[in-house]
Amino acid sequence: MKRININENKINIVFDIEDNGQIKLMHFSALPFNENDIWDEMYEKDHLGCFDIAQVEIAGLDRPCERHGTKYIVTAPGYRLKYKDLSDTRDNIGRLIKVTQYDEPTGIEVISTFRFYDGISI
C-alpha cells in the first residue's frame, strides 16, 4: 500500500493506494489524520465500497453487495475503479489536484477534481 498525504490551506488530505490498485480517500479534514479513528470491521473485512473517491453506475452491470438496508452501497463499475494517476498543479487562484481512475473491462476513465483556493480553507 502507498499513502499520499497532502496539506493545503490547513486541510489534511490522505489517499491510500491499495495493493489491488484501488485508491481510497481516507481523510479530508482540518484535523490531523489518525488511522484508528476510522478503522472498522467492515473496512477490515473486504474494503468493498469503503472510502471510494467516486461511484459510477452503468445501466446493465450487476452490483456486488446488493443492498444495505433500503439503499445500494456499491455501484458498478465504481467498485472496480483502479488508480491511474494523480496530478497536482497550481494556477493563479490556487491548487488543483486531479485523481484519474479507470475500469479496464469497460474502458471508462473517471477524473475526480479537488480545487483549493489560495487563502481559503474550504
Map each language-model feature to its residues.
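Short, surface-exposed, low-complexity cationic segments
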Residues: 20-34
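Conserved, mostly hydrophobic/aromatic
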Residues: 10
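Extended, loop-rich substrate-binding clefts of extracytoplasmic carbohydrate-active enzymes
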Residues: 60-121
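Hydrophobic beta/alpha structural segments that scaffold and line small-molecule/cofactor pockets
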Residues: 13
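Extreme N-terminal starter segment of soluble prokaryotic enzymes
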Residues: 2-4
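A charge-rich, low-complexity, intrinsically flexible signal that marks solvent-exposed coils, linkers
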Residues: 38-52, 56, 61-63, 95-97, ...
